[in-house]
Amino acid sequence: MYFQGDPHFKYLLIMKEIITALMIWLGANSDFNVNMDIPTVMFLPQDKMEQQYYGDKKHSDINLHAFYDTEHDIIVLPDTWDRRKPWDLSVLLHEIIHYVQDQNHIQFNCVQEMEAKTWPLQQKYLQQVHDVGWDYDRLWHFMISHCPNGY
């Protein structure tokens, strides 16, 4: 339990406001139903975040930006996440999209299909809200947003 004198209290209020603003933006810029409670967000050091996401599985050396834990309905961000950086805000939006997909019980043939709308919406958000161009590799996006072997 946090109290108004606790320094974490103010940060929790700021996060609630940021998440609410991102969900309002998402509702206005997509066909997703965002009429739901806001997600819980947890911050972890990079190594702990990767351990929680990958477990003992081998993974690339590319840093994990964040993830949405579907089992616990929690967005996990690195403890280096900064609310003043447009990219970091867009990463949070990306994970909020996964939360909204999950809460709306949207069915996918595979987990990769969850990425189909996230990258374009993240790009639109960066351009529209922060005037930041993000020209991601569309072939890479296609590869990671479709089921392996066509399933």
Question: Predicted regions: what is each one?
Answer:
Residues 78, 100-108, 128:
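Substrate-binding clefts and substrate-entry loops adjacent to catalytic sites
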Residues 111-146:
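Post-HExxH zinc-binding segment in Zn-dependent metallohydrolases
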Residues 13-17, 82-91, 108-116:
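Soluble non-cytosolic domains of exported or imported proteins
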Residues 2-14:
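Short, Lys/Arg-enriched N-terminal segments with co-localized hydrophobic residues
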